[in-house]
């Protein structure tokens, strides 16, 4: 038991920094997953369960199960307090499709028409029409790279992963269609975990959200023919934060000329849902 505990700690330390573990060259994982390595003492039953789990193939795990794990692991009396409820992918898609996927696809379709118009004028690769078409595509990729999705109560990260998947699907389609229009295919994608931001009050859920995004990103890349990234394998996900999304109220002073007497807003009080916060002068 003690030898296994020490062996696992040594493995996790190596995964954090990269290097040799016995005869094996372990990649540099980073990402904060092994920032603090504390392996608990393992009993015989723990070791048996660990061995059984290690014999399974986890490469195609459905990351949405982490939501169920999180909800079932909570004290039932605290679920409503935390607003913790597993939302199935079909329900999440009802938000993602009209808010993220469809608007981006519509923008891409308009841009693709412009690229096709320039393509018809291309005499040779590298001429001014080709360069103009390529620049349109690069500008589009920059837009996707800088696109951000925020879930201020992200739970175990199902929404974040499905939002990232939608972004990556749009980019993959863009690359495929751009290649059919004669543009050189880019070597890698610009979308990734940096596109999704999350806030979660529960520390366990916030960590699950990071794992969900990490695993989902790796699975998507492999399924679409891309190698997983190296140095590091995992991007740091500090933008999935463990804190309360409701920030503390900062007292404000109302300017008597900017608020009507019946607006309901008072200095030092939280404004209502339709009332502006008045900054201190």
Q: What kind of region is each of these model predictions?
A:
Residues 1-166, 195, 199-205, 243-251:
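Preference for the N-terminal adenyl/adenosyl cofactor-binding alpha/beta module
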Residues 143-150, 156-281:
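Class I S-adenosyl-L-methionine-dependent methyltransferase module
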